Structure formats: structure tokens, C-alpha cells
Amino acid sequence: MYKGVILSVLASLTFGVLYFYTEFLKPLDSEQTFAWRMLSTLPFLTLFMWWSGDLSRVAEIFKRLLQKPQLILWLIISSFLCTTQLWLFLWGPINGRGLEVSLGYFLLPLVMVLVGCVLYKEKLSYWQIAAVVLAVIGVSHEIWRMGQIAWETAYVAVAYPLYFFLRRVFKTDHLGGFWWDLACVIPVAIYLAAFHSNSFAVIAHFPHLIWAVIGLGFLSCLGLGSYMLASRYLPFVIFGLLSYLEPVLLAFASMVLGERISADEWLTYVPIWLAVLLLVLEGSLHLIQQQRKQRALAQNVAALEERLEDKSPK
């Protein structure tokens, strides 16, 4: 559980850095950036899985594929659901649609909570219920303010929960499954990088892009790998609520990139920030209670050992 929380927080922090990191990838456009993100992430992910001993997961899925060739259909669908989200994540800030994308990440945790409660019968604590209510207020206000839900928002909010749910159904909810998501899109990435637009010429003209692409691969591996592992270790409800840290960081990143929160948008963001604060407080109180229980248990064990020593024959 704690491992999942740490991984989720690490993923959110890394995604916040990545949102800002797009500035270092100019003048690559969103398609070129996406292509190089896929091409640079897979080697880092493979290296990490070799180091952690998870590379066998890739072979495990390959064996399943040989036994049931129809599994390739799921791998293609999984890759599409995953990688189109990664493309949109980069496309948004580059094309001035960062806040629409970030609103999708505001709505996403609510959909995740709904999936957890309905499909997995998971229960919410009082703190989590309060956080959900605040989140509903913020998201509802934003939908009312905009008058509609942008397609970027809807796609983020719906496709990700579907992706994580189906990963559990098809038992690919581990790094091996994510490796296949990236591997399936590599032909598309090569086409976008080399043929759709000659990004090699752009990189040759701007040599700093070589290091920027390497950094993109490392950060993507760190963030996405942590995110995928967190989805495996955490219940759907907790995983969804912890995801609220990400849109908070994305909103700040969007403002750093030049977008601004207007006066009528604050009723969207303040309730979300309060929801995140409640989750942090709940987590902190839970940690304090756990530490107290551990101390009390240690004291009881010490007292018991002392009584046993007193009763033992001298």
C-alpha cells in the first residue's frame, strides 16, 4: 500500500516536470515529440526492467501470445488507449490546450473512484468522501463555466479508466504490459520521426534536442513506470484520488507556460486543491496512527519479554 502511494506521488511529480519539459523540445511539434518520446522511453524502460528483474514479464506475455494469438488484438487496443493519452499529454501544452487537458485529469480521478466503487465494491473513508464532494464541486463548476466538455477533457477522463480496468481484466497490469504498449507503437513512432516529417534534420539543426530527447526518455520511463506500478499496488479508489496531485501540478505548469487562471476559474481549482489537502491530511494521520500502533506493539512485546524473564527459573 505505502509503496503504491510513494509510486503514485513520484509519478505525479514527474508528470508535472514533463509538462514543463516540453519547452526544451522546441521546435519539435507534438507529433515529432510524441515519436521521440516513444523511441527514447522504450530503451530506458527495458534497461530498468532488466535491472529490477521484471523483464521476464515481457516474455510471459509473449508466451501467452503464442498460446492465444487473439491476444494481439488486446495488445493493440491497449497500446492505442495508452499511447494516444501520451500523445495528447504533449499535444495540449504545445497547442495552447493545456488547461483543457488538465481538466481531463481533474475529472479522471472521479471516474476512477466511480469504477472502483461500482465494479470493485471498494469503500470510501469519510475523508475520501469529503474529498470527492469537493472535487465534484470544482469539476462541475468548470463544466458549467465552459458550457461543454472539450474532447480533450472527455478523452482523458474516459480512456484512462477503461485502459486500467481492461489491463486488470486481461492480466497485463504490470510493467511487461506497459512494455508491449510501447513496443506496439514503435512502427508508428518511426514513421512520424523519419517519414511524416524529417525530425532528424530539425535535431541536426538544434543539437540540444539530442540531450532533450534523452532526458525525455528517462523522465517518461520514471513517471510512466511509477504510474503503472502504482495502479497495480493500489485499490482503484485510492489510485484515483491520489491522481488529484497530478492536475494540480499540471495547472501550475500551464501557468508557468503562459496560460492564466481567470477570476471565474478559481471556484474550479480551489475545491480541487482542498480535496488534495484532505487526502494529504488523511494520509498523514494514518501514518501517525500506524507509528503509534507500532510503538505500542513494541512496548507490549518488551513488557511481555520482561515478565517472561522474571518468571523463568534463576
Stretch-by-stretch model annotation:
Residues 107-127, 248-267:
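C-terminal transmembrane-helix exit sites in multi-pass transporters
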Residues 9-17, 21, 76-93, 155-166, ...:
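Hydrophobic alpha-helical transmembrane segments of multi-pass membrane transport proteins
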Residues 1-34, 137-169, 294-314:
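Glycine-/small-residue-enriched transmembrane alpha-helix faces in small-molecule transporters
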Residues 1-13, 43-77, 126, 178, ...:
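Membrane-interface interhelical linkers
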Residues 25, 33, 37, 92-93, ...:
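Hydrophobic/aromatic residues within transmembrane alpha-helices
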Residues 146, 244-314:
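C-terminal-most transmembrane helix of multi-pass membrane proteins
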Residues 102-107, 174-184, 221-255:
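Helix-helix packing/entry segments at the starts of transmembrane helices
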Residues 20-31, 59-62, 91-97, 139-145, ...:
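Membrane-interface helix termini and inter-helical loops of multi-pass transporters
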